[in-house]
């Protein structure tokens, strides 16, 4: 009996030991294999528990396909999730309740300049209020019209970007043009040659470096034979001066502009002014000159802003240097920068190295005299008043007697009678009455062409 009992015990013991080796990989069953081999009943009871690990060990290689399948499923699910997200995002965009702002279709010069844009918003009411829409030969239209934009920029610049002030000035300028009709003055008006002959000219020179025309206006004050006669009729003098200015503006070709100038850049639509004081004496101020200068300032500062590029005072006596010193107190640095006093007129050509030779010889160039090369307003011989012989000694009447020689056209061309009478009566009047023609008229015309700069700093 003892042998029979021992044999199964060994078998059971071996059986118990085999799973024990396998259980190394199954830590959870280590407690069962560690049971003592003496109790067969416990071994038999534990045997079924050992079978399970066997089956598990045989089925162990199966998980990889399941993992691959799970990974594939996860990838597919992730793709689906991403697609759902994309669709959800797309739906979210479409369903955005906030309206999208329309693109700004305005020109860049309005987008980048709020003041100019506001100024254009006021253009229609400005034109309606003034009852006139023409400025310097250009019909004011809208922000798509380059000539209109350039003119609006000039008025805004003249007022340092202040829209309200620019609007007020433009209204006044349009009202003045409606009343004065300066285009007609330049095109069809005729002025007495005895008063204005030789006083003003316009020339144009080609600058080879820029391939653009440079417009000059010349005021030759030494040609004035009788100050009272030339400046005595204030309304007539202003009309003559306006007509000359309009002719110069016509040379700028503002109406032909195809592009808008840079608000903060160079202005290509400006002119150069030359005031010649040869043979003019500066002793005292004539009341007529004072009145003419004051009126010129008022008119030109309103109606012709930002048209002056540089201003040259030639043949100016050294003693007149005080004029520019005084002007520095009242004018801005920008205006003073445009003033160039030149004592000797022949040095003027040196200021323009690229086309200086075209300037008249009188001013250091090789060009013809202004009487031959310059353009001016329409002049006509004024009719001589019926005067008694003893009245011919009156200096103010002497120039008016020029046509009495018989042939008015020939008299105007030769200026014969005027030359005969000038030494006797007119010459003393010039030194006496044109003393401050330079300081009065110089700032007058300069300020008229640059009103924004005419304000004190």
From Swiss-Prot:
Residue span, CRAL-TRIO domain: 196-371
Entry-linked InterPro entries: CRAL-TRIO_dom, CRAL-TRIO_dom_sf, CRAL/TRIO_N_dom, CRAL/TRIO_N_dom_sf, Sfh5
Biased composition (Basic and acidic residues): 39-59, 380-391, 418-427
Bilayer topology term: Peripheral membrane protein
Binding residues for heme: 221, 241, 275, 277, 311
Annotated localization: Cytoplasm; Endoplasmic reticulum membrane; Microsome membrane
Catalytic activity: a 1,2-diacyl-sn-glycero-3-phospho-(1D-myo-inositol)(in) = a 1,2-diacyl-sn-glycero-3-phospho-(1D-myo-inositol)(out)
Chief place where the protein resides: cytoplasm
Cofactor: heme b
Keywords: Cytoplasm, Endoplasmic reticulum, Heme, Iron, Lipid transport, Membrane, Metal-binding, Microsome, Transport
UniProt xrefs under Pfam families: CRAL_TRIO, CRAL_TRIO_N
Biological process per Gene Ontology, one example term: regulation of exocytosis
UniProt keyword annotation of Signal present: no
Stretches with biased composition (Polar residues): 7-16
Compositional bias segments (type: Low complexity): 428-457
Region span, Disordered: 1-107, 378-457
Gene Ontology MF terms in the entry: metal ion binding; phosphatidylinositol transfer activity
GO-annotated cellular components: cortical endoplasmic reticulum; cytosol; endoplasmic reticulum membrane; plasma membrane
Entry's family note: Belongs to the SFH5 family.
Role played: Non-classical phosphatidylinositol (PtdIns) transfer protein (PITP), which exhibits PtdIns-binding/transfer activity in the absence of detectable PtdCho-binding/transfer activity. Regulates PtdIns(4,5)P2 homeostasis at the plasma membrane. Heme-binding protein that may play a role in organic oxidant-induced stress responses.
Name listed for the protein in its UniProt record: Phosphatidylinositol transfer protein SFH5
Designated gene of the protein: SFH5
